[in-house]
């Protein structure tokens, strides 16, 4: 035995020898240090976490093993239970509690954060905390929880942080060392399974690099054969452009990337399966499987198909027969039996977990996945395929970063199974091999803190430690640590700007030169002109809104903008004066609601008599009515469309005065004015940049503490906190807020304390709770205005009250210079209401598209949002001051947790 007796015992039980980085990290841990381990996916970081479990059990103390996802917690609980036995290992994931008093408990990070704020007795005897996937602290929504835990754990707890490879590991380790004491940073960039990079051009596979050429310099060169082939391919395309083509014929020489079945067949022939193909859209993943099913592609033997069917039946046996067709079960099953599957967050969890089990077992050979698979789920492959090097980030298509490329291709190569892993990029004419080489060669994935105070965090810190200690804690965050370091670069930027300003000023005749005065005056005129144009646009929009609200049934109007331009008749007046959207039928037979974006606000050009009921969805009715509209308008004088000037009749005395000063300025008629003005404008631009940098320096210094004080100010104003700023006290309402963990925590607390959600039936409560958790996918976070399609009047009233509370809260936030909370979103209200009432999945999913948006709700999203509603309902059940509301929340939970929502709750 050596001095590291426990490490010797631990390794003696392992079926493999420790790698060097694992040995170093475990040795540091036994010597009493905390550790930060940064290593590639699949390198074996979790061995270090498991050694912390071993040390805790050997010492008779406790270890908490935290993960960011419930699925990961379930997986780790299964692994540890198999090794140490059911009595030694517990599981806490918010909606699941198994043996919570065990010496080793696996949990989501949020559960541990909540324990810390509640001073839970379970923290007694805690010696180790393993934080798996600690790089999640960069996540905008959930990342702050990791820092809250690291900062607030008792000093004698050793933290084991396990992270993917990040380029600023030393900075991250330096921060942990500062706040946690002795911490050993272990960085290992060596992949246990070498990764080979390839490019698939048509049906030919090329190595991306020629490693023989670059070995001497240590940096491989792009494969010349690949470059030559692509050059020939592009030349063939150019020649094809010049070829005459018969009508209707294609372009025989034009390059088309291989189809998905062809790619999978090629990988199969090359012995490169199993493979994960990353497709950056859910619909694309499903379409890929459908394309493969339409081809002769089959990747499984008869024996494998029997095993696959057994797993499917075991995993999905609890699903109701009536739901199977709605879920696309039969096509999904057929894909699995042929060794093919999609994997994305829109899938039912039971389906997704079945795919993971079958792929890990080597039974499913080709998976088409979104990038979410690269985060956390243990599902390595022999090969990773990238169809594109750009992805949609919710707003626009952006190129993959080197960090994203590394994370995605990191799935290639299964330790202990594959000798090497493979990354394949599908070539398109817009892709340059050098671009792929740059992504593959760069290891830039810096960890950036997302830490920021929330209302719940603020109230808990005030309650536990008071404002002064809270300031000190916030000043120790990784966010502040990075901000303080960034100030150095900002100050250098200011100094560089000042030097350039001095040089330009010397050229122009000093910092008070007449040309600079003239340039400032010209900039002011431009600013005032822009402000006047904005005011004019707002005035026109308001005029259009007022005119829309005044329209009555039968009015004939002219739609002035957009594709629907021309005559229209009003079928139904607007319901909402604040956002009027009357229903109209155009002369081109289109029926729908228009907004101020379609209408300039001109008065109706006439009117016509309409039938009592107009079935505008029927083509025949639309045709006849459009004909009647044209006849009614035949004798009317239709005013010609005219362009409204930007100024819109506004008169701004300051603008007129500034223009006059500009014309009279001595420099105005100087020779060579434009050359001088260019330099002067450059001076003003650098001056503005410097002012912005100075504001950033001021904001970076103690920025979190100042934000915290603004939160305290707002909470004091709303009576969640009482007393002077130096000695605040949390009120009863504040204690209510302290128990709400939600992005909309303060709004929920306001709804509970004001009684906005009282008197509701269970399905109605589920509906209004969904409005504060749901966020429309790909939208602006707001659903349609609460209208007549809300299921019940009482629910509509509760939604309206919630919306009003949100509006006043957002106004207060703006007054306190706090980023406004997002508004309620009613996009899931009808869905959850119908599910709660009926348990009918088809009816619930159909309710998602009641407004005809054409964007169906996927089953996986449905389950995910149901579970978020369940989580908040559970908090309402525990925190609401009204006993009747607590009971209603409990019944609502029972109504939601059934069918597909209850199946496979991991």
Swiss-Prot record:
<dbReference type="InterPro" id="IPR001650">
    <property type="entry name" value="Helicase_C-like"/>
</dbReference>
<dbReference type="InterPro" id="IPR012961">
    <property type="entry name" value="Ski2/MTR4_C"/>
</dbReference>
<keyword id="KW-0347">Helicase</keyword>
<dbReference type="Pfam" id="PF00270">
    <property type="entry name" value="DEAD"/>
</dbReference>
<dbReference type="InterPro" id="IPR011545">
    <property type="entry name" value="DEAD/DEAH_box_helicase_dom"/>
</dbReference>
<comment type="similarity">
    <text>Belongs to the helicase family. SKI2 subfamily.</text>
</comment>
<dbReference type="Pfam" id="PF00271">
    <property type="entry name" value="Helicase_C"/>
</dbReference>
<keyword id="KW-0378">Hydrolase</keyword>
<dbReference type="InterPro" id="IPR014001">
    <property type="entry name" value="Helicase_ATP-bd"/>
</dbReference>
<keyword id="KW-0547">Nucleotide-binding</keyword>
<dbReference type="InterPro" id="IPR027417">
    <property type="entry name" value="P-loop_NTPase"/>
</dbReference>
<dbReference type="InterPro" id="IPR050699">
    <property type="entry name" value="RNA-DNA_Helicase"/>
</dbReference>
<dbReference type="GO" id="GO:0070478">
    <property type="term" value="P:nuclear-transcribed mRNA catabolic process, 3'-5' exonucleolytic nonsense-mediated decay"/>
</dbReference>
<feature type="binding site">
    <location>
        <begin position="39"/>
        <end position="46"/>
    </location>
    <ligand>
        <name>ATP</name>
    </ligand>
</feature>
<protein>
    <recommendedName>
        <fullName>Probable helicase HelY</fullName>
        <ecNumber>3.6.4.-</ecNumber>
    </recommendedName>
</protein>
<feature type="short sequence motif" description="DEVH box">
    <location>
        <begin position="132"/>
        <end position="135"/>
    </location>
</feature>
<dbReference type="GO" id="GO:0016787">
    <property type="term" value="F:hydrolase activity"/>
</dbReference>
<feature type="domain" description="Helicase C-terminal">
    <location>
        <begin position="259"/>
        <end position="463"/>
    </location>
</feature>
<dbReference type="GO" id="GO:0009274">
    <property type="term" value="C:peptidoglycan-based cell wall"/>
</dbReference>
<feature type="domain" description="Helicase ATP-binding">
    <location>
        <begin position="26"/>
        <end position="184"/>
    </location>
</feature>
<dbReference type="GO" id="GO:0003724">
    <property type="term" value="F:RNA helicase activity"/>
</dbReference>
<dbReference type="GO" id="GO:0055087">
    <property type="term" value="C:Ski complex"/>
</dbReference>
<dbReference type="GO" id="GO:0005829">
    <property type="term" value="C:cytosol"/>
</dbReference>
<keyword id="KW-0067">ATP-binding</keyword>
<dbReference type="Pfam" id="PF08148">
    <property type="entry name" value="DSHCT"/>
</dbReference>
<dbReference type="GO" id="GO:0003676">
    <property type="term" value="F:nucleic acid binding"/>
</dbReference>
<dbReference type="GO" id="GO:0005524">
    <property type="term" value="F:ATP binding"/>
</dbReference>
<dbReference type="GO" id="GO:0005886">
    <property type="term" value="C:plasma membrane"/>
</dbReference>
């Amino acid at each position: 035995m050596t001095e590291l007796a426990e490490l010797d015992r631990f390794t003696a039980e392992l079926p493999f020898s420790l790698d060097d980085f694992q040995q170093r990290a475990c040795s540091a841990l036994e010597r009493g240090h905390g550790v930060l381990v940064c290593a590639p996916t699949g390198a074996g970081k979790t061995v270090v976490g498991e050694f912390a479990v071993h040390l805790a059990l050997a010492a008779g103390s406790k270890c908490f093993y935290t993960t960011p996802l419930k699925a990961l917690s379930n997986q780790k609980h299964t692994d540890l239970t198999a090794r140490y036995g059911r009595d030694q290992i517990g599981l806490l994931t918010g909606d699941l509690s198994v043996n919570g008093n065990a010496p080793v408990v696996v949990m989501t990070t949020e559960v541990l954060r909540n324990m810390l704020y509640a001073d839970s007795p379970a923290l007694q005897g805690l010696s180790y905390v393993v934080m798996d996937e600690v790089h999640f602290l960069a996540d905008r929504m959930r990342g702050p929880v990791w820092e809250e835990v690291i900062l607030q754990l008792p000093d004698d707890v050793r933290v084991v942080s396990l992270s993917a490879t990040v380029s600023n590991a030393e900075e991250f380790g330096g921060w942990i060392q500062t706040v946690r004491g002795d911490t050993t940073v272990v960085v290992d960039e060596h992949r246990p399974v070498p990764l080979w990079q390839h490019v698939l051009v048509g049906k030919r596979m090329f190595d991306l690099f020629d490693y023989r050429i670059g070995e001497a310099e240590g940096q491989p060169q792009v494969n010349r054969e690949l470059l030559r082939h692509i050059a020939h391919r592009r030349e063939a395309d150019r020649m094809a452009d010049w070829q005459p083509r018969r009508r209707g014929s294609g372009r025989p020489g034009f390059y088309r990337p291989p189809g998905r079945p062809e790619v999978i067949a090629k990988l199969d022939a090359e012995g490169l399966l199993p493979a994960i193909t990353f497709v950056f859209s859910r619909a694309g993943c499903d379409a890929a499987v459908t394309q493969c099913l339409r081809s002769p592609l089959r990747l499984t033997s008869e024996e494998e198909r029997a095993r696959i069917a057994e797993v499917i039946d075991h995993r999905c046996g609890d699903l109701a027969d009536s739901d199977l067709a709605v879920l696309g079960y039969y096509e999904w099953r057929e894909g699995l039996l042929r060794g093919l599957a999609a994997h994305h967050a829109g899938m039912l969890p039971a389906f997704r977990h079945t795919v993971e089990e079958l792929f890990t077992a080597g039974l499913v050979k080709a998976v088409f996945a979104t990038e979410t698979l690269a985060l956390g789920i243990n599902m390595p492959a022999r090969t990773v395929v990238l169809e594109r090097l750009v992805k949609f980030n919710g707003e626009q298509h952006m190129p993959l970063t080197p960090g994203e490329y590394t994370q995605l291709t990191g799935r290639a190569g299964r330790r202990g199974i594959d000798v090497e892993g493979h990354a394949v990029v599908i070539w398109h004419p817009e892709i340059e091999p050098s671009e792929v080489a740059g992504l593959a060669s760069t290891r830039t994935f810096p960890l950036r803190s997302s830490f920021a105070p929330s209302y719940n965090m603020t109230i808990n810190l005030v309650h536990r430690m008071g404002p002064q200690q809270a300031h000190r804690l916030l000043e120790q965050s990784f966010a502040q640590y990075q901000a303080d370091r960034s100030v150095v670069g900002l100050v250098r930027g200011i100094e560089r700007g000042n030097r350039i300003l001095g040089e330009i000023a010397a050229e122009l005749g000093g910092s008070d030169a007449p040309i600079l005065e003239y340039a400032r005056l010209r900039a002011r005129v431009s600013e005032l002109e822009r402000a006047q144009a904005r005011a004019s646009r707002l005035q026109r929009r308001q005029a259009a809104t007022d005119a829309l609200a005044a329209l009555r049934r039968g009015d004939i109007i002219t739609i002035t903008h957009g594709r629907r331009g021309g005559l229209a008749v009003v079928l139904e007046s607007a319901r909402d004066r604040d956002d009027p959207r009357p229903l109209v039928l155009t002369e081109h037979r289109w029926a729908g609601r228009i907004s101020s974006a379609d209408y300039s606000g001109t008065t109706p050009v006439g009117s016509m008599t309409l039938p009592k009921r107009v079935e505008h969805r029927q083509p025949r009715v639309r045709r006849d009515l459009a004909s009647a509209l044209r006849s009614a308008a035949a004798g009317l004088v239709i005013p010609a469309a005219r362009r409204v000037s930007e100024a819109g009749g506004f008169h701004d005395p300051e603008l007129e005065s500034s223009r006059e000063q500009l014309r009279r300025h001595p420099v105005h008629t100087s020779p060579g004015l434009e050359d001088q003005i260019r330099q002067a404008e450059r001076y003003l631009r650098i001056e503005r940049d410097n002012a912005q940098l100075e504001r950033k320096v001021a904001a970076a210094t103690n920025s979190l503490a100042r934000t915290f004080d603004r939160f305290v100010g707002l909470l004091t104003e709303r009576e969640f906190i009482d007393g002077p700023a130096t000695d605040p006290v949390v009120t009863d309402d504040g204690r209510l807020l302290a128990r709400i963990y939600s992005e909309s925590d303060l709004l929920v607390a306001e709804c509970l304390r004001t009684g906005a959600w009282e008197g509701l039936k269970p399905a109605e409560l589920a509906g209004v709770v969904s409005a504060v958790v749901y966020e429309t996918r790909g939208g602006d976070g707001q659903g349609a205005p609460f209208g007549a399609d809300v299921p019940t009047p009482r629910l509509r009233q509760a939604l309206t009250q919630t919306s009003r509370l949100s509006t006043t809260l957002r106004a207060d936030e703006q007054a306190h210079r706090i980023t406004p909370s997002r508004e309620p979103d009613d996009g899931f209200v009808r869905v959850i209401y119908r599910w709660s009432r009926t348990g009918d999945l088809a009816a619930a999913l159909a309710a998602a598209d009641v407004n005809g948006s054409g964007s169906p709700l996927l089953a996986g999203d449905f389950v995910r949002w149901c579970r978020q509603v369940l989580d908040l309902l559970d908090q309402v059940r525990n925190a609401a001051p009204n006993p009747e509301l607590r009971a209603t929340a409990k019944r609502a939970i029972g109504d939601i947790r059934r069918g597909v929502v209850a199946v496979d709750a991991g």
